[in-house]
Amino acid sequence: MAKEKFVRAKTHMNVGTIGHIDHGKTTLTAAITKALSYKGGADFTPFDMIDKAPEEKARGITINVSHVEYQTDKRHYAHIDCPGHADYIKNMITGAAQMDGAILVVAATDGVMPQTREHVLLARQVNVPALVVFINKVDMVDDEELIDLVEMEVRDLLNSYEFPGDEVPVIRGSALKALEEDNPDGPWTQKIYELMDAVDSYFPDPVREIDKPFLMPIEDIFSITGRGTVVTGRIERGVVHTGDQVEIIGLSYETKKTVVTGVEMFRKILDEGEAGDNVGCLLRGIEKDEVKRGQVLAAPGSITPHKKFKAEVYVLKKEEGGRHTPFTKGYRPQFYIRTADVTGTLVEFSSGAEMVMPGDNINMTVELIYPVALEEGMRFAIREGGRTVGAGVVTEIIE
């Protein structure tokens, strides 16, 4: 029989488990793979396989992340699980493994704990579109009313961080019991199916990069005699066609308008370039010295230049190659935002703290010396003297 070819018929989505340490995130991840393996939608991945998370590098930061995959009738999922609390923070801030939706795991025995709060806050800051809740370890709580209280507490927490806490699906179960059950029709395994039904129906389909408005960070600029100026870069999102109107944004508040008169890839002329392509765009009526690395080429009106913003930042420890000493307000490092490398000042820390230690994560206000194309949810690196000292995500634009 001919080998079956991979058909991309289902929507692909990135999800993950979040929540306090020892509340059962990894056990639940294993239980999902086991439950779906009965239906042929996954290979069962045991707990200790997931717990040995391999190291990954993102923006110079080492993060331990486990990836498993599984599918339901509706979607194909890539699921991430991190062994340590610090790994979650680093992952969410750097966007190393992006989440289109997250499963918040809360132990019925404990209720909402400090990391539960921190993960929900981070999910809000980095714009995770939707959460569902799994109240775990309900087999260890005899009084149903206690579980009701935990559910109310979780819904209140979600509301306080602007998630729709009253409508978020909350499923009660036991990941460990589901793993021990070995029966696709068992009551605990049914709870896992119930959770996956909620994930299928409640998480909205992610917007693909190619369907978003066109944006390309400018890496290099060339002048071609008789033809004009070419800017090169990797298209971050959307599609660009020959003849499209675009804007050149950043480095000043003035936005230049131009038309793409040609798109080239590997020295061949194309009709269009799309997200992920490394291309050169020929621009009408633009001189070589009017464009700089660090600006972006974008669909008109889709992004604007800004200097001042709030960001959630993870400060690297010295073992990660970061600073050995804390820094205070007024610190002026370099901010690497897409292809721009711009000096900025830390105006203030939201917590009212006076200084930040290596290994901390903190929300801060930053003011750049000149404007760059900025939007909420955008990632950046902070560097000083040639080394990365922090990684951040824009949470709010001020001006």
From Swiss-Prot:
Residue ranges constituting the tr-type G domain according to the UniProt record: 10-207
Pfam families per UniProt: GTP_EFTU, GTP_EFTU_D2, GTP_EFTU_D3
The UniProt record lists the keyword Protein transport: no
Region annotation (G3) ranges: 81-84
Top-tier EC class: hydrolase
Compartmental location: Cytoplasm
Segments for region (G2): 60-64
UniProt-listed SUPFAM superfamilies: EF-Tu/eEF-1alpha/eIF2-gamma C-terminal domain, P-loop containing nucleoside triphosphate hydrolases, Translation proteins
Residues that bind GTP: 19-26, 81-85, 136-139
Sample GO molecular function, one term: GTPase activity
EC number: 3.6.5.3
Residue segments, region G5: 174-176
Family annotation (CDD domains): EF_Tu, EFTU_II, EFTU_III
Residues annotated for Mg(2+) binding in this entry: 26
Catalysed reaction equations from the record: GTP + H2O = GDP + phosphate + H(+)
Region (G1): 19-26
KW DNA-binding (keyword) present: no
UniProt keyword terms in alphabetical order: Cytoplasm, Elongation factor, GTP-binding, Hydrolase, Magnesium, Metal-binding, Nucleotide-binding, Protein biosynthesis
Region (G4): 136-139
Annotated Gene3D superfamilies: P-loop containing nucleotide triphosphate hydrolases, Translation factors
GO cellular component, as recorded: cytosol
Subunit comment: Monomer.
Record's function text: GTP hydrolase that promotes the GTP-dependent binding of aminoacyl-tRNA to the A-site of ribosomes during protein biosynthesis.
Similarity section: Belongs to the TRAFAC class translation factor GTPase superfamily. Classic translation factor GTPase family. EF-Tu/EF-1A subfamily.
Protein name, UniProt field: Elongation factor Tu
Species of provenance: Petrotoga mobilis (strain DSM 10674 / SJ95)
